[in-house]
Design a protein with these regions (language model features):
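Non-globular, low-confidence helical/coil segments that flank catalytic cores
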Residues: 1-211
């Protein structure tokens, strides 16, 4: 977990192997961003355990960057135990009649800050069409890009102010993400890579050198 002040902004990156399950908390509200990993049941179990350790039995918000299994596969298991008041989905798929589908940039009040949600649909694969999420409070900024590719990152840099304290490194450290232009724009103090045993070479040395 990381956060300058626990009540203002806290991000917990759960250990789910080659996947991503993130818990964002601010001002007494909790949001799960993605719910996937090397095992659908393990990522759901670890998300439950984290919430229940804080006596939390529901979520204010559930968001997905995209629908690849390593970001989404634990969702059904998770929702059997803990409900979400609001669900936000990227407008790249109609897989779930579950919540609000976002097709344009929008801002959502959350805790003591604002969630800026930036959908993208210019990639060649669904994972490259990831929705980027920037959470900002007065004292903290967190940028999450899912598996967004370099073209999507450059679009973000061109269209938005992206300065953030924490960067969740895109696509588990793949060389096809985390371009120099993005790093120059964000200037993170801390970069976190959610990764586990894999056959893709993640995180690549190229990305580690850029960081």
């Amino acid at each position: 977990s990381y956060g300058p002040r626990a009540d203002d902004c806290r991000l917990t990156v759960l250990d789910v192997g080659e996947g991503q399950t993130l818990l964002l908390q601010s001002g007494g509200q909790s949001a799960l961003i993605d719910c996937g990993g090397y095992s659908d049941t393990v990522c759901a179990d670890r998300a439950w355990q984290m919430l229940r350790s804080q006596n939390l039995y529901d979520l204010d918000l559930l968001l997905f960057t995209h629908f690849d299994r390593d970001h989404f596969g634990g969702t059904e298991n998770f929702l059997t135990q803990i409900p979400a008041e609001r669900v936000i989905l990227p407008g790249i798929s109609e897989l779930l009649p579950l919540g609000q589908v976002v097709t344009e940039d929008c801002a959502v009040p959350f805790g003591k800050g604002i969630l800026h949600i930036y959908p993208y649909s210019g990639g060649n694969k669904e994972q490259e069409n990831s929705m980027a999420i920037l959470f900002e409070t007065e004292d903290c900024g967190i940028l999450i890009t899912g598996d967004l590719d370099v073209a999507g990152e450059r679009r973000l840099v061109k269209n938005h102010a992206l300065g953030a304290d924490i960067l969740v490194v895109g696509h588990h450290g793949s060389k096809y993400a985390t371009c120099p232009e993005l790093l120059d724009a964000v200037q993170p103090e801390l970069a976190v890579i959610s990764v586990g045993e894999n056959n893709y070479g993640h995180p690549t040395q190229e990305v580690l050198d850029r960081l």
